[in-house]
Amino acid sequence: MWPFSRQQNVSRILPIVPTAPRRFPVWFPAVLVLVLIALDQWLKAWALAHLQLNAPAIPVIPGVLDWELTFNTGAAWSMFSGSAVPLALGRILVGLGILSYLLWKPQGRFLTVVLSMIAAGAIGNSIDGLQRGQVTDMIHSPLLSAVTEAINGTRFPIFNIADMCVVGGTILLLVASLLPERKREKAVPEA
């Protein structure tokens, strides 16, 4: 039997050095943003080619997910309706600002992914606002609509991948900010 535990032996040989958070390569945020924007734009093009405005919803996963084409000149729940171009300019500034920050000052992996999602969503919807004067939405959730109808009598908005990126990234960022920060425990050398 060893006089010390394995951890004690290792810590006597190798000092515990705090490590920086693991990071992606500096180009990763730009690639992730481009991939998410491409996916968003592809689905919007598909929806414009295959779905009809005011047509009945097409169930994908019955009761959970439907295809339903609509357009929005504002933000969620039609807030700021008729303001597509000013909203698009604001979104593109936010998206490019976040992406520039990530490229200029690399962050840990979690924050890089979350902020890249938000940037991609902002830029994806700004492309629609600048090109068409409206944002193309096509994803509807009957399940989420049932919840919002029970709470306040309104249907959950129809959304797109860009919206999912912004909302998902924001929720993840909020949850992470509420969790206690994990700190590495430093071993105290024994005398």
Swiss-Prot record:
TM stretches of this protein: 26-46, 84-104, 110-130, 156-176
GO biological process, one term: proteolysis
Disulfide bonds: none
Membrane topology: Multi-pass membrane protein
Subcellular localization: Cell membrane
Enzyme Commission no: 3.4.23.36
A Pfam short name: Peptidase_A8
Pathway: Protein modification; lipoprotein biosynthesis (signal peptide cleavage)
Catalytic residues in the record: 137, 163
GO-annotated cellular components: plasma membrane
Keywords recorded for this protein, A-Z: Aspartyl protease, Cell membrane, Hydrolase, Membrane, Protease, Transmembrane, Transmembrane helix
Record field: catalytic activity: Release of signal peptides from bacterial membrane prolipoproteins. Hydrolyzes -Xaa-Yaa-Zaa-|-(S,diacylglyceryl)Cys-, in which Xaa is hydrophobic (preferably Leu), and Yaa (Ala or Ser) and Zaa (Gly or Ala) have small, neutral side chains
MF terms (GO), sorted A to Z: aspartic-type endopeptidase activity; endopeptidase activity
InterPro entries assigned to the protein according to its UniProt record, in alphabetical order: Peptidase_A8 (IPR001872)
HAMAP family in the cross-refs: LspA
Known function: This protein specifically catalyzes the removal of signal peptides from prolipoproteins.
Family statement: Belongs to the peptidase A8 family.
Name of the protein this chain belongs to: Lipoprotein signal peptidase
Gene: lspA
